[in-house]
Design a protein with these regions (language model features):
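Charged, amphipathic alpha-helical regulatory modules used
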Residues: 2-131
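Conserved catalytic cores of very large enzyme subunits
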Residues: 114, 121-505
Length: 506
């Protein structure tokens, strides 16, 4: 054996010996043996990622691996951090090929982001369970964060936020993170559900529905109709993440049905007509009172799958269907009276109930002194003074601006007109999710220049539009069976279980 060969063999043996003694400290603190094969594999993968073929770069790759190995083994310390190894690899790759070096660096940063998100997720969930994550626990006043049922929903929400960040394009998330836009409800983004809606209660009550695989037929009294309405509301709330609205107009026919039922009851008694009419009116008023009370208690005591009461609004629009204006007025009066009276809390003190929100429409027959239903508006104003409810909506202004008067979905989201056979349709519709542009942020970024302001605004509006398109695309292929109460049993539509909901959305 020649002298040079002996020397090379000795050097290789020394290198192998040093390599076998070298230890790597991983990110979680665990210590494992140094393995050059892992580095070799990572570099090969980086070249394949960029050039789709590493064969022509084998010599370069070999040089990089040799130099990386040399630098690591020259370290006097027995232990070396994984981050330091990655720094060395990126430096050596960059010396040979900056494109691959950038790809390697980008991959490393992406892996770091994933690791950080996992660590953050664990920390957020742990904080929900031990009560230290006050941001998550107190984010929604309608959710009692200390309850186990609510905590399950909050934990799922934290996972959804992490997953959403991996699904939503980087530029959109960056705009959200810096406050230029707000992507609402990231804690529900991964689920195949939508935001808020106007429930088609008329269809569900008149034609029947299904709740928990049980057939619910058309009610035969107001009391039953009001109870079914609250059950529908709870089911809908468990199938979406936003608010919902029903209208008293859809319940008004059952006031008439109850009256007719009471009239039949008294018809068999030989009583003076005036006395009989008084008895009928009194019994009907009692049923309305009991029905509204049941409705209020049901809405405020039911708990949905996400650990909260249904975010429900009730539309009070006297002229929505002129045939039932009188019946809507009777229901509205009782809703206002009971809201004024308050609901006892756990201490037995009458307080303002949370739900439903009341949406009271001002029109020609209830706005002016002397108008037929002005007494209702005076009652509503008393209610507002004490209970900060109802919200007021102007029929005149809505018709001037939009052309039609209709309620908001839940609290504030409002639909644009949509026509079927030339007629506007609002009930049985909803929205897919919400994005908000931060106008003060836009103004600051544009440095108070009007031209720049609109350019910046267009940029962020475009991101919001893309986010809306993502929500739409995400629902493609989703079947009606994902939320039967919405898509199969009338709240939104009457599809078959295997029908695509996107066809209805289109």
């Amino acid at each position: 054996m020649k002298g040079n060969d002996i020397m090379n063999n000795e050097l290789m043996e020394n290198a192998r010996s040093r390599a076998s003694e070298k230890l790597v400290v991983k990110r979680d603190g665990k210590i494992c043996p140094y393995e050059l094969s892992r580095i070799r594999s990572a570099i090969y993968k980086a070249y394949v990622e960029v050039y789709h073929n590493e064969e022509q770069f084998k010599e370069k790759i070999g040089e990089i691996i040799t130099e990386v190995n040399r630098r690591i083994l020259e370290k006097e310390e027995q232990k070396i951090d994984i981050e330091e190894i990655q720094d060395i690899v990126i430096e050596e790759v960059n010396k040979v090929d900056k494109v691959v070096g950038k790809a390697f660096k980008d991959y490393r940063e992406e892996r770091n982001r994933i690791r950080e998100s996992k660590q953050k997720l664990y920390k957020e969930v742990e904080g929900i369970l031990d009560g230290t994550n006050l941001k998550a626990l107190n984010e929604n006043a309608n959710k009692k964060g200390y309850m186990s049922s609510t905590q399950r929903d909050l934990m799922a929400g934290e996972l959804s936020k992490v997953m959403a960040r991996r699904m939503i394009p980087k530029d959109i998330m960056e705009a959200h993170d810096k406050g230029a836009i707000k992507i609402h409800d990231l804690d529900y983004y991964v689920n195949n559900i939508f935001n808020c809606d106007l429930i088609n209660l008329e269809d569900m009550l008149q034609n029947g529905t299904v709740i928990n695989n049980k057939m619910i037929e058309k009610p035969k009294s107001l009391r039953t109709a009001m109870t079914i309405a609250t059950q529908i509301s709870a089911q809908v709330a468990s199938s979406q993440y936003g608010g919902q609205t029903i209208t008293l107009t859809h319940l008004a026919p059952f006031v008439r049905i109850s009256r007719e039922k009471i009239e039949r009851k008294f018809a068999k008694y030989p009583i003076n007509k005036d006395i009989k009419d008084k008895l009928i009116d009194d019994e009907l008023k009692l049923e309305i009172k009991d029905s509204v009370q049941t409705f209020n208690y049901q809405v405020n005591t039911l708990q949905t799958s996400n650990g909260q009461s249904p975010f429900l609004s009730v539309c009070i629009y006297l002229n929505e269907n002129p045939e039932y204006t009188k019946e809507v007025a009777m229901l509205a009066e009782e809703f206002f009276k009971q809201r004024l009276d308050g609901m006892k809390n756990k201490f037995g003190i009458k307080a303002t109930q949370t739900f439903p929100k009341l949406l009271y429409f001002l029109d020609e027959n209830n706005t002016y002194e002397g108008s037929e239903y002005f007494y209702l508006t005076k009652l509503a104003v008393q209610c507002t003074a004490l209970r900060m409810n109802p919200d007021y909506m102007s029929v005149k202004k809505m018709k001037q601006v939009i052309g039609y008067a209709f309620p908001t979905m839940g609290c504030r989201a409002i639909l644009s007109p949509w026509f079927i056979d030339g007629k506007p349709v609002f009930y049985g519709r909803g929205n897919l999710g919400v994005q908000t542009v931060n106008l003060p942020f836009v103004a600051l970024e544009s440095k108070r220049d009007e031209k720049d302001f609109f350019e910046v605004l267009d940029k962020y509006l475009n991101l919001c539009r893309r986010m809306g398109e993502l929500r739409y695309e995400k629902l493609k292929g989703v079947k009606a069976s994902v939320a039967p109460i919405l898509w199969q049993y009338g709240a939104i539509s009457r599809l078959n279980p295997n029908d695509d909901i996107i066809d209805e959305i289109d």
